[in-house]
Amino acid sequence: MAKNIKTNKKPQQVNKKEMSKQHAKQIKQQLNETVATGIIDGVFVYTEALSIADFANQIGKSVAEILKYFFAQGLMLNQNVVLSEEQMAELALEFGFDFRKEESLTKENFFEALDASEEDKPEDLEHRAPIVTIMGHVDHGKTTLLDSIKNTNVVGGEAGGITQAIGAYQVKNKDGKKITFIDTPGHEAFSEMRSRGANVTDIVILIVAADDGVMPQTEEAIDHAKLANVPIIVFINKCDKPGADPERVKAELMKYEIVAEEYGGDIPFVQGSAKQKIGLDQLEETILLIAEMQDYKANPNKLAKGVVIEAHLDKAKGPVASILVKEGTLDIRDMIIAGTTYGNIKHMEDETNKKVLKAGPSKPVVVYGLNEVPSAGDKFIVMNDEKMARTIAEAQAEKKLAAERQSNQIFSLDSIKKHIDDGELKAINLIVKADTQGSVEALKGSLTKIDIPGVKLNIIRASVGTITLSDVTLASTVTDGIVLIYGFNVRPDAVVRKKAEEEGIEIRLHNIIYKVIEELEDAAKGMLDPEYKEVVTGSAEIRATFKHSDIGTIGGFHITDGSIERKSKVRIIRNGIVIYTGELATLKHLKDDIKEAKINSEGGLTIKNFNDIKEGDIVEGYKEEEVKK
């Protein structure tokens, strides 16, 4: 069995230099260690997922026996299919073997393997400050709440208070208890870190304005908070304003399964005003109560590990990174690996611009000395061996590059049947956006009735509105199975389409509910009709309208993007909602018929069987091309 990496052997008796030396030595041993696999004393031992051919070889069975087993379950597989850990365990038991996974450390799986291998002794753990993230709709008071908390409680009571925008802050209440707040630009950044495996936060505060209620970004924040699977506190803000209605907010949140304790739920609610600093004490008490119940602990007496919160390149100081220590203690002059970067910590300071020499669990600091700028969400670990740090960082960079090259090679709708048969697909995750709440509810009701044997169908978001960057960001955080975004009478703009393509997220657009259901069911059965890719050729803004007695309403247009051809299919978009899809009847420049209108050109158009075109409408031209399989 591979040895666990221990960095906490009697830390009180081992100095930092000796601990670092031992740590580097143990990692070197593990990197060079070959773990014995196969059948050992009647136990199937493995380190990673295996193909059917490799698995059969390791347990001394024929490929035919393995394939026969799956065939009896209705799965037609081949010897190159890579088995999941659950399938290997199932097969091991079927053939009379127990099973055990051994961790094997490599330069490529360095951070993941360390996370899995290190376990602290209970007696080495000490309580740490809870780490809190505030999320909510724009203008509901997130920034004001953070500012009020920072200005009310400053660690150590330093004059001047918190001055640095480092992405995280630690405050101390009147009883001396500390809380760390993560200040991300939005829930997209929060989820981006989570998608990289960096589970940064312990608690999410959902802020909702009492005079505004649940808004679109509130819904998005709820989705992200639930996916993070951490306790949620609701802070109803602006209770001092005219029109404030906290009870309405509580009622609205019930639709999202956010139910207050007073109504039989398990979500604590706090009412107040961030601007007037009302309710802040109760909010902090609630955070600390949850922290006490959850019993957040870490071992401070080991080499530090943590997460990069944000980073940038300073022209004078070089790469600068804001990091959060999750466990252990970071010392100045430590060498760290942070994702694909490494370097000695030459200088370290906190949110008050004060130089610090050490940073323990839950402490955010700014560090200088890395060779390059790391990415938000990168994990870091102390590695006081420069040669090894450089080697591991380079391997991480190669791994990242390979992942980027394959980012578009994900499961597509057309390949669902094959991946189900191969046993590679366990979940289909859907984000559903529609033009009305009625459409949303109808789609949810129909989708939940779909039954695909062996595959779980999850609706991770269903809401009214156009397809946004937030939807694509949420989709990119999903790691289990495939994710599809469905638009019902709504569609993405050019920026969102491009982002989805970059992330390898498939967007499907429909205007008939049963077509969505049929498409998913047929995909599971491998019966999809030829797939047509929609290519948007251009967009035009209607800037004026004219009535004509013979041909109806003429839309005076300006081409804002690409071009629109006379033969193009078009859709009319009003306030982000598709209100009509059809064909052009006429396309003119002055009095002349034209075949195409290019970017920045102007003219007049009419739509077949549609006479309700209005100023401000967007006319989007598109064509359909069959996707070559």
From Swiss-Prot:
Alphabetized UniProt keyword annotations: Cytoplasm, GTP-binding, Initiation factor, Nucleotide-binding, Protein biosynthesis
Pfam annotation, one family: IF2_N
Record region (G3): 183-186
Main location group: cytoplasm
Binding site for GTP: 136-143, 183-187, 237-240
Region (G2): 161-165
Residue numbers spanned by region Disordered: 1-20
GO annotation, cellular component aspect: cytosol
PROSITE patterns linked to this entry: G_TR_2 (PS51722)
Region (G4): 237-240
Keyword Cytoplasm set for record: yes
One Gene Ontology molecular-function label: GTP binding
Domain of life: Bacteria
Residue ranges occupied by any tr-type G domain in the UniProt entry: 127-297
InterPro entries found in the cross-reference section: EF-G-like_DII, IF2_II, IF2_N, P-loop_NTPase, Small_GTP-bd, T_Tr_GTP-bd_dom, TF_IF2_bacterial-like, TIF_IF2
Annotated segments matching region G1: 136-143
Keyword Endoplasmic reticulum belongs to the record: no
Region (G5): 273-275
Compartments where located: Cytoplasm
Family as reported in the entry's similarity comment: Belongs to the TRAFAC class translation factor GTPase superfamily. Classic translation factor GTPase family. IF-2 subfamily.
Function: One of the essential components for the initiation of protein synthesis. Protects formylmethionyl-tRNA from spontaneous hydrolysis and promotes its binding to the 30S ribosomal subunits. Also involved in the hydrolysis of GTP during the formation of the 70S ribosomal complex.
Name the record gives this protein: Translation initiation factor IF-2
Organism: Mesoplasma florum (strain ATCC 33453 / NBRC 100688 / NCTC 11704 / L1)
Primary gene name: infB
